[in-house]
Structures are given as structure tokens and as C-alpha cells.
């Protein structure tokens, strides 16, 4: 015997009803099947609104609407399965809804709805589901036995939330003679009290019915069919990268359900656990999925984690006072009164000082709990033995579930670390006595961030880097291409880079999970979200996961002034933008102080030498005790190209024009020939070495006369540049005559004196052969002398710069 239960989403329309019938038929070929059915999706909730709201003449219209849903359902079934007995089924539907109308008319006369009538109204959907399924199966030549839950399942409790007496129900069902070849059908959600009245079983009552019937029939397995593949590691609606759990124990399932997992209710697990009946969660829409099995305890050595859940709309009562100290009586009174009034207490946390206790409950009960506690402790409050109740609202409880979780190393520390990375405060923590759960209380506004962080840290097998990219010009686009190309390599290293935002100066593309890099340009063009700093800061406020990084591939000064704010929000910063590192020494220092305080990384390898490992090499050298003696370098790819062409006999104006055409220069080449860009790079190096200087402290010997500043138009500038062709040709020739070449060089002396100028160098100089856009940096240090440390390679270009940014990105997790 196997029991199958199908929920409302599995019976939402005609096609799904018939799909369920197919599953039943297939299973019935192997063994006898008992089936518990819910009402079609939304029907029970729809009928519940009738009894929850004021009952008036409008209710009859709602009854007709509900009836029409069923009529349309069986019409569709008839079209798909012609042998279905439509008229007989329609007649049953008419009879049931006529009963409802008579009940409603009676209620209208007496102006109230008796408690015993409410379950009759809201259970019509389940009863009709069974009749429809019976007719589908019989039209396919199957024998069907219908179990009446009112006469066979004895309930204890109120009309709308009863509990089943399993022992008595077993006796009743055992007396029924059911043919072995018959398919058994029973309406879920329904039972009967000792007076024989129909009652219902409360929230998730159909699942509970299924577990009870499985116990009564001694079923070898209870299959719960729903619209998900099984139990996932978290709610996929709010958490990315969830995955299906193959197996969980009864206790783990109980903890998951208690702390918010929506797949099963704790009451459902109790009977299958008591009678050791395996349970499997299956997907009606994906019958091939293996589902999640729920069974006996895991192997004691299995410490694997099973899920992270949440309960929201939580409040926390803080109760304090001298009467709590050394007095178990006061605490007992608190929880006795709450239990007597059926108030659900989710967590209890007692202060080590013994004069304070906290407990969490649902926000909807706040007023009533306050009322009964104030009434119970009127004297203590009046005498000052108990302080006014402090209530913290808008909270969420996050819980991590797993076998022997208390014995698993570092779980709590990992939870705190993952939340700390996004500056989420933990207000309280509780450890389950079963050793299967750890629960923490946080602010509701931090739910999405907190649960995603914890899940990524504990359950996702890869290290995730969340990227917010600003700037999609040449470097930004090249970076996206490189990361897409390296996806397989990253996957092998268990690294997942997720782009959450891509932006330029006008608009942005943002996704909660990850932007698909295969078609990001197409989606970016479709995006209508504008970009400005106000919008950006608002967006970043609640989106900082673990390892969240802002990458600045712009040259925007205003954006660079936001770095401290970004770091304080929990983001690492990677920038190819030199503006921050060449700003005032005060701002330069503040960024680093903030990054250190917030435990965030500020990386800028591409500020000097593009993809060359300049900054990282310097930091490694000086952190191991080396000291600079002197530095000389060619720091501009455009000037490296231009001066190399001069050496070959090309005129200055022609060399500059060619450099611009090849993309080496800025839009107006004056910016390159002014030497200011080289000075900025030199400033970055000098500060990295340890010199506290400003840009104005660097001596710049200009390549061009002052008058060339006024030519802001690049065409005009290049035309006027011809005036200097003969001067530079003559200077190049003079140097050549004695075996020298001209190079534009940045220098740092041991005393921190920095200069940028044209130098004439001979063939013994390491910079002699550097041209064609290459950069070269020579460091004379205590460790590297008399032969210097030389770093040489292309120091300009989108691909090499992007590779430097990519390298910094991987350093975030290394």
C-alpha cells in the first residue's frame, strides 16, 4: 500500500487533474494506492473569505462564482477525456452548491454563522475534488472506494483546527473491507468529531490527513505531490543558488517546517515519524524528479546542513525586573498564561544576568499578549518589581537546520561572519535543544540580504563574487568578455562571478541574482533605469552580499569621491580610475583607513602600468622590508609609442596622429603630451612607496609650450603641432649622433623628490629599447641593486587594463 496526496496546485485545472489521474494509474499498476485530495488551487481560500467577512447578499454571488469554476473545470475535462461523465458530475456540483446556498440563506436569517457551519462551507472544494477524480478514474475502468473522513477520522478540538485521534481512527478504518484492486480516495482537510459533525484540520490540513491515513493503512510510503521538486535548501523566491535535498530526517523536517519552510507542516511529520513511514515530496509538473525523501535519523557522523529558513512579521518582548532574579515562579507564570491563551512562543532567550528574559512571537498577537501580561503582573509593575515591557518590532528569525549542528565546527562563526560582511546586526541567538537548529533574530529589513549571505556561505559550493560594474567603455566591455571567456576555468576553481549591476553614465541594468553575460548588451539597451549617484546609493543600500565589489572603469572624479561611502556600505572597491589615488593626501588616507576599519579591500592595480603587476609587486617588496633607492619609468603607453616613432624618424605631429588613430591617446592628444597623466601615475607610485606628497609637488617639464593649452579641438591641436616637428626632429638627431634616444620618464629619488621630463638615455639604460606603447618600470632597491627590478610590457589598451581589473577581482577572495 502506498499513499499519494495531491495539493491544490496539482489540481488547478483540467490538464492537471488528468495528469494526477495518470500518476495514480501508473502507481496502481504496481501496488494498491490510497489518494488524498485537496481542493483545486485557491478554492478553499476563496470559500474561507465567505465566512471571514460579513455575510450578506453578495455572498450568494460569490457562491455562484465558485460553482462556475468547477463547471468550467469539468467542461475542460470532458473536452480532453470524452468518456468523462460530465452530466453526473455537474449534477453533484449543483447539489453541493445548492446546499451551500440554503446554508447561506439560513445564516442571513439569523445574522450570524454558527461555528459548526463554517467547516461545512470551506470544505466543499475537497469533497468535489474527490467526486471529480472518482468519475475520471471510473471512466477509465478503475474500481474506486471512497473513504468518508467524517466517519472514519475521529477528531479532537475545535471546528476549524482539529487534531486526529490516530488510535481510534485506525480501529475504524481497519473495520472497512476494501478490495485489494480498488483505488482508495479520500478528501483531505476533513474529519469528524465524536458527535459525527464535520470539522476541518486547520492550516495544511490535507497534508495532515494524508499522514494520518498513511498511518491508519500502514502504508509503506507517503508521497506528497506538490508544485516543487522537493525540499530546497532555502526559499527559491528570495534566495538564488538553492538546490534540492535528496534526504532529510524526520527531526530535520520538523525543524525546517517549524521555522518557516513551506513544504510540510510540523503536524504532518508527527504521525509519519511516530509510525516510521517514509515520506517523499514530489512534483506533479516534473514527475521524473527524484524528490526529497524524509525518513529515519541520518548517520550520527553526518553533520551536513539541510537548509536556512525564515519567519517574518516577528516581535520580541524584553521583560526585565528584580522579580525575575532567582525566581523561576515569575518566568513560569509568564509562559503559563501565554500557553493557556494559546499564544505561540517561537524562541526564548534568557539573559545571563537572570533579571531579564526575551521571547519572540508573531506580530499579530502583540496587543493581546500585552493585555494578558499586564493583567497578570499588575501588582509587580505597580511595585516596580517588573519594568515596562519593551517590544522590538519588525523582526525576522533566520534558522539554519542540520543534523548535529551544534557539533559542527564554526557554523555559528560562519553565520555571524556572513551577516557581518553586510553590516547586519544579530539581536538574539538561540540553539535548538534537539541540536538540529541555530536561530538568530535580525531586523526585517535585512531579511533578503541576511538569508542570501548565510545560504551562500553555508550551502553554495562555490565562492561567489557579486560585481557592480560602473563604466562599460573599452575597458568595461573587455572585462565582461574576459570573464565570460573564463567561465569554465572559474567553474573548475569553484568560483562564481555574478554581475548584479552594469551601468554607464546614463542608465543601469540591475538584477537581483545575476546578469547573463551572453546577452547583457541587448538587455542593457532595453533597460529604462536611469543612473545617477542618488539612484545608485539607494540601490546599493540593501544589496551588499558577501564578497560584493564595485568596479569603477570610468575616469569620473565625482564617482571616485563616493568610495568611502561604498566601503561603509560593505563593498570592496576595484578601480582603474586614478582620480581617488591622486586626490588630496587627506582623501587618499581616509579611503585606506576606512577600508582597514571595515575589513574591505581597495584595489587599483591598473592605476599604473595597466595589467602589469606593479602595485602588487611594490606592496610585496616593501611588506618584506625592502626600501627604495630610486625609480625611473616610462609610464605612458601613448608617449612610449610617440617617442619610439620619433626615434624612427617620424615627425612629432605624424607620430601623434598615428597614436591617436591606434587608440593610444586621449580624445585630445594634448592631455597625453601635457605630461599630467604620467605625473598622476608617478604620484600613485610615490605614495605607495610611502612618500606623503601631493600632485603639485611633482616637477613636470612640459613637452609642449604653454600656448598649446588653448587648442582644445583635437584637429586644431594636431595641425598646430606641426610647428614643433622640426624642433623635435633636430633634438632626436642630436641624441642619435651620440648613440642616445629620447624618452619621457618619471623619476623618484630616495628623498621623495619626483619629476617628469624628457630624458636622453644611452643603450645601457633598461629603458633604452622601450617603445611601441610599452611601459617599463625600473626599481633600484636594497634587494635589487646594482641590477634593478624591471617590469616591462604593454601599459595601455583595453584588454591589458581589463586583465588587471580581472586579476584584482580574483584577489578579493584570495
From Swiss-Prot:
Na(+) binds at residues 605, 608, 610, 612. Keywords: Amino-acid biosynthesis, ATP-binding, Kinase, Lysine biosynthesis, Metal-binding, Methionine biosynthesis, Multifunctional enzyme, NAD, NADP, Nucleotide-binding, Oxidoreductase, Sodium, Threonine biosynthesis, Transferase. The keyword Metal-binding applies. NADPH binds at residues 475, 554-555, 576, 578, 797. InterPro entries: AceGlu_kinase-like_sf, ACT-like_dom_sf, ACT_Aspartokinase, ACT_dom, AK-HD, AK-HSDH_N, Asp/Glu/Uridylate_kinase, Asp/hSer_DH_NAD-bd. Bifunctional aspartate kinase and homoserine dehydrogenase that catalyzes the first and the third steps toward the synthesis of lysine, methionine and threonine from aspartate. Residues 470-814 are annotated as: Homoserine dehydrogenase. Its cofactor is a metal cation. Homotetramer. The active site is at 681 (proton donor). NADP(+) binds at residues 475, 506, 554, 576, 578, 663, 666, 797. Residues 319-400 form the ACT domain. Residues 1-248 are annotated as: Aspartokinase. It comes from Buchnera aphidicola subsp. Schizaphis graminum (strain Sg). This is Bifunctional aspartokinase/homoserine dehydrogenase. Pathway: Amino-acid biosynthesis; L-lysine biosynthesis via DAP pathway; (S)-tetrahydrodipicolinate from L-aspartate: step 1/4; Amino-acid biosynthesis; L-methionine biosynthesis via de novo pathway; L-homoserine from L-aspartate: step 1/3; Amino-acid biosynthesis; L-methionine biosynthesis via de novo pathway; L-homoserine from L-aspartate: step 3/3; Amino-acid biosynthesis; L-threonine biosynthesis; L-threonine from L-aspartate: step 1/5. Residues 249-469 are annotated as: Interface. It catalyses: L-homoserine + NADP(+) = L-aspartate 4-semialdehyde + NADPH + H(+); L-homoserine + NAD(+) = L-aspartate 4-semialdehyde + NADH + H(+); L-aspartate + ATP = 4-phospho-L-aspartate + ADP. A sodium ion is seen in the structure; a metal ion may subtly affect the relative position of the nucleotide-binding region to influence enzyme activity, and could increase the stability of the enzyme. It holds the Pfam family Homoserine_dh. The keyword Iron does not apply.
Amino acid at each position: 500500500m502506498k499513499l499519494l496526496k495531491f495539493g491544490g496546485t496539482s489540481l488547478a485545472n483540467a490538464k492537471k487533474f488528468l495528469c494526477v489521474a495518470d500518476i495514480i494509474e501508473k502507481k496502481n499498476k504496481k501496488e494498491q494506492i490510497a489518494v488524498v485530495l485537496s481542493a483545486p488551487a485557491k478554492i478553499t481560500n476563496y470559500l474561507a473569505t465567505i465566512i471571514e467577512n460579513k455575510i450578506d447578499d453578495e455572498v450568494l454571488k460569490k457562491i455562484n462564482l465558485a460553482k462556475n469554476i468547477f463547471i468550467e473545470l469539468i467542461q475542460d475535462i470532458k473536452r480532453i477525456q470524452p468518456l468523462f461523465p460530465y452530466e453526473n458530475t455537474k449534477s453533484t456540483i449543483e447539489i453541493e452548491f445548492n446546499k451551500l446556498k440554503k446554508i447561506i440563506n439560513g445564516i442571513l436569517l439569523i445574522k450570524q454563522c454558527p461555528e459548526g457551519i463554517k467547516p461545512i462551507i470551506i470544505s466543499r472544494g475537497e469533497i468535489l475534488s474527490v467526486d471529480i477524480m472518482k468519475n475520471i478514474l471510473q471512466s477509465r475502468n478503475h474500481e474506486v472506494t471512497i473513504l468518508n473522513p467524517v466517519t472514519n477520522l475521529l477528531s479532537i478540538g475545535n471546528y476549524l483546527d482539529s487534531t486526529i485521534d490516530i488510535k481510534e481512527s485506525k480501529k475504524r478504518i481497519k473495520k472497512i473491507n476494501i478490495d485489494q484492486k480498488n483505488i482508495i480516495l479520500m478528501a483531505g482537510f476533513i474529519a469528524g468529531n465524536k458527535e459525527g459533525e464535520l470539522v476541518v484540520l486547520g492550516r495544511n490540513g490535507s497534508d495532515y490527513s494524508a499522514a494520518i491515513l498513511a498511518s491508519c493503512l500502514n502504508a509503506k510510503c507517503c508521497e506528497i505531490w506538490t508544485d516543487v521538486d522537493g525540499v530546497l535548501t532555502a526559499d527559491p523566491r528570495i534566495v538564488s543558488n538553492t538546490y534540492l535535498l535528496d534526504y532529510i530526517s524526520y527531526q530535520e523536517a520538523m525543524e525546517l517546517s517549524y521555522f518557516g519552510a513551506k513544504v510540510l507542516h510540523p503536524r504532518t511529520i508527527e504521525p509519519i515519524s511516530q509510525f516510521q513511514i517514509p515520506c517523499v515530496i514530489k512534483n506533479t509538473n516534473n514527475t521524473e524528479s527524484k524528490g526529497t525523501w524524509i525518513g529515519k535519523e541520518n548517520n550520527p557522523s553526518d553533520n551536513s546542513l539541510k537548509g536556512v529558513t525564515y519567519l517574518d512579521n516577528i516581535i520580541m518582548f524584553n521583560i526585565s525586573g528584580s522579580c525575575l532574579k532567582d525566581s523561576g515562579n515569575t518566568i513560569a507564570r509568564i509562559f503559563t498564561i501565554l500557553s493557556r491563551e494559546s499564544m505561540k512562543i517561537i524562541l526564548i532567550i534568557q539573559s545571563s544576568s537572570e533579571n531579564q528574559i526575551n521571547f519572540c512571537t508573531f506580530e499579530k498577537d502583540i496587543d493581546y499578549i500585552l493585555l494578558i501580561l499586564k493583567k497578570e503582573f499588575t501588582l509587580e509593575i505597580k511595585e516596580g518589581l517588573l519594568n515596562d515591557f519593551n517590544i522590538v518590532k519588525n523582526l525576522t528569525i533566520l534558522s539554519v537546520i542540520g543534523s548535529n549542528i551544534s557539533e559542527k565546527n564554526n557554523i555559528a562563526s560562519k553565520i555571524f561572519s556572513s551577516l557581518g560582511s553586510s553590516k547586519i546586526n544579530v539581536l538574539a541567538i538561540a540553539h535548538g535543544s534537539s541540536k538540529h537548529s541555530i536561530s538568530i533574530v535580525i531586523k526585517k529589513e535585512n531579511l533578503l540580504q541576511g538569508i542570501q549571505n548565510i545560504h551562500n556561505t553555508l550551502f553554495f559550493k562555490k565562492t561567489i563574487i557579486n560585481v557592480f560594474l560602473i563604466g562599460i567603455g573599452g575597458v568595461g566591455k573587455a572585462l565582461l568578455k574576459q570573464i565570460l571567456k573564463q567561465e569554465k576555468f572559474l567553474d573548475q576553481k569553484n568560483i562564481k562571478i555574478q554581475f548584479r549591476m552594469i551601468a554607464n553614465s546614463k542608465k543601469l541594468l540591475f538584477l537581483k541574482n545575476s546578469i547573463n553575460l551572453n546577452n547583457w548588451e541587448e538587455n542593457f539597451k532595453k533597460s529604462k533605469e536611469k543612473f545617477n549617484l542618488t539612484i545608485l546609493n539607494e540601490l546599493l543600500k540593501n544589496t551588499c552580499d558577501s564578497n560584493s565589489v564595485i568596479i569603477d572603469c570610468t575616469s569620473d572624479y565625482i564617482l571616485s569621491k563616493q568610495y568611502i561611502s561604498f566601503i561603509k556600505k560593505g563593498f570592496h572597491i576595484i578601480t582603474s580610475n586614478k582620480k581617488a589615488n591622486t586626490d588630496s593626501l587627506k582623501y587618499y588616507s581616509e579611503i585606506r583607513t576606512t577600508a582597514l576599519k571595515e575589513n574591505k579591500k581597495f584595489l587599483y592595480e591598473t592605476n599604473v602600468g595597466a595589467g602589469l603587476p606593479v602595485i602588487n609587486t611594490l606592496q610585496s617588496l616593501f611588506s618584506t622590508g625592502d626600501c627604495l633607492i630610486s625609480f625611473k619609468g616610462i609610464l605612458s603607453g601613448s608617449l612610449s609609442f610617440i617617442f619610439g616613432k620619433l626615434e624612427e624618424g617620424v615627425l612629432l605631429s605624424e607620430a601623434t596622429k598615428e597614436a591617436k588613430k591606434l587608440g593610444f591617446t586621449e580624445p585630445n592628444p594634448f592631455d597625453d603630451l601635457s605630461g599630467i597623466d604620467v605625473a598622476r601615475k608617478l604620484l600613485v607610485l610615490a605614495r605607495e612607496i610611502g612618500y606623503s606628497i601631493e600632485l603639485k609637488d611633482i616637477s613636470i617639464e612640459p613637452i609642449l609650450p604653454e600656448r598649446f593649452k588653448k587648442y582644445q579641438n583635437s584637429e586644431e591641436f594636431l595641425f598646430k603641432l606641426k610647428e614643433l616637428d622640426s624642433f623635435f626632429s633636430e633634438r632626436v638627431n642630436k641624441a642619435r649622433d651620440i648613440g642616445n634616444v629620447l624618452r619621457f620618464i618619471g623619476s623618484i629619488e630616495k628623498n621623495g623628490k619626483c619629476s617628469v621630463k624628457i630624458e636622453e638615455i644611452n643603450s645601457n639604460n633598461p629603458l633604452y629599447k622601450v617603445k611601441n606603447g610599452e611601459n617599463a618600470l625600473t626599481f633600484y632597491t636594497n634587494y635589487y641593486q646594482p641590477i634593478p627590478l624591471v617590469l616591462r610590457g604593454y601599459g595601455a589598451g583595453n584588454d591589458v587594463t581589463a586583465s588587471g581589473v580581472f586579476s584584482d577581482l580574483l584577489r578579493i577572495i584570495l
